[in-house]
Design a protein with these regions (language model features):
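Hydrophobic, Gly/Ser/Ala-rich alpha-helical and linker tracts in large acyl-processing enzymes
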Residues: 96-109, 116-119, 125
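Short, small-residue-biased leader/transition segments that mark boundaries at the very start
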Residues: 1-6
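Feature marks short, surface-exposed loop/turn motifs that line or immediately flank catalytic pockets
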Residues: 40, 93, 180-182
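Residue(s) in the substrate-gating loop at a strand-loop-helix junction
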Residues: 36
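Catalytic helix-loop patch of NAD(P)-dependent Rossmann-fold dehydrogenases
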Residues: 10-18, 25, 30, 39-91, ...
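C-terminal substrate-binding subdomain of Rossmann-fold SDR/epimerase-dehydratase oxidoreductases
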Residues: 112-250
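Alpha-helical segments that scaffold the active site and NAD(P)H-binding pocket
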Residues: 21-22, 73-74, 117-121
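Structural signature of the Rossmann-like NAD(P)-dependent dehydrogenase/reductase core
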Residues: 31-33, 85-88, 144, 175-176
Length: 250
C-alpha cells in the first residue's frame, strides 16, 4: 500500500537524479522524461493544457512526477547545452497489435484495463468500479485513455524534435492524450462490446486519491511534435484482450 508507494517514490527520485548526473558525466545532451497527468492534481476545468496550473498531487506517485519535472527544469537551466522534453502521459492502455508485447503487472493490477482483462480471463473474481456517485454523467471517474502504441510514437517524435534542434526552449512539456474523456463505466461497457463478453463487476466505495475527471488538450503535441493519437479506443481494448489471451497460452 502506501508504504510501498513511498519506497517507490524514493527509488524514482534517486534513479532520476542518477540519470541526470550520468548524462553530464558522459556528455549526453537530450532526455525524454516520462511524466504524468497526475501532476495536474484535481484540475478546475477540462481539458487541461500544458499551461494549466499544477495543483497538489493526490498521490505519492503524482508528487514524485512533480518533483522530477522540477529537477529536470532546474538541471536544464543549470547545464547549458542539455535539452529535455517531459511527456505528460494520460492513461496508457492496450498492447502491441501483434499481442506479443503488453502490460504484465506484478501482483494485483493497480491499473483499470489489466484488472478488466484479468477479470474477463477468470483470473480475478470481480472488477471493482470505485465510486458511481461522482459529479459526472454516469457517476464514475473520467480519464483520457491513450493507446500504448500512440504513446511510443510520441517518444519518437520528441527524440526527433531534439535531434533536429527544433526545440523552442531547453525544457519543453507536452500532454500526450487523445483529448477525449471516457468514464470508467463507459470503458467497461466498450470492452464488453468489442470483445463480445460480459464482465463481472460491482460498484465499490470511492478510492482515496482518485480525482473526478481529467482529459488532455493535445494541441501543442499535435502542432509542435507533429504527433496525434490515432488508434481508436475499440481497437485498443481489442489488443488489450488479445494480449491477455496470449499470456494465457504461454
Amino acid at each position: 500500500g502506501s508504504e510501498m508507494c513511498i519506497r517507490d517514490s524514493g527509488n524514482n527520485l534517486t534513479s532520476f537524479m542518477n540519470v541526470i548526473g550520468l548524462m553530464r558525466e558522459f556528455g549526453r545532451r537530450n532526455i525524454v522524461f516520462s511524466s504524468s497527468c497526475t501532476v495536474y492534481g484535481e484540475p478546475e476545468k477540462q481539458p487541461v493544457t500544458e499551461q494549466t496550473p499544477r495543483k497538489p498531487a493526490t498521490s505519492p506517485y503524482g508528487n514524485t512526477k512533480q518533483m522530477c519535472e522540477d529537477i529536470l527544469r532546474d538541471s536544464l537551466a543549470a547545464y547549458p547545452g542539455m535539452k529535455g522534453i517531459a511527456l505528460r502521459y494520460f492513461n496508457p492502455i492496450g498492447a502491441h497489435p501483434s499481442a506479443l508485447i503488453g502490460e504484465l503487472p506484478r501482483g494485483v493490477p493497480q491499473n483499470l484495463v489489466p484488472f478488466i482483462t484479468q477479470t474477463a480471463a477468470g483470473l480475478r473474481e470481480c472488477l471493482s468500479v470505485f465510486g458511481d456517485d461522482y459529479p459526472t454523467p454516469d457517476g464514475s471517474c473520467i480519464r483520457d485513455y491513450i493507446d500504448v502504441v500512440d504513446l511510443a510514437k510520441a517518444h519518437v517524435a520528441a527524440i526527433n524534435r531534439m535531434a533536429g534542434d527544433k526545440n523552442k526552449q531547453a525544457y519543453e512539456i507536452f500532454n500526450v492524450g487523445t483529448g477525449r474523456g471516457v468514464s470508467v463505466l463507459e470503458l467497461v461497457r466498450k470492452f464488453e462490446e468489442v470483445n463480445h463478453l460480459k464482465l463481472n463487476y460491482k460498484i465499490a466505495p470511492r478510492r482515496a486519491g482518485d480525482i473526478i475527471a481529467i482529459w488532455a488538450d493535445p494541441t501543442l503535441a499535435n502542432t509542435l511534435l507533429g504527433w496525434r493519437a490515432e488508434r481508436p479506443l475499440e481497437e485498443t481494448l481489442r489488443t488489450a484482450w488479445q494480449w491477455q489471451l496470449h499470456l494465457g497460452q504461454r
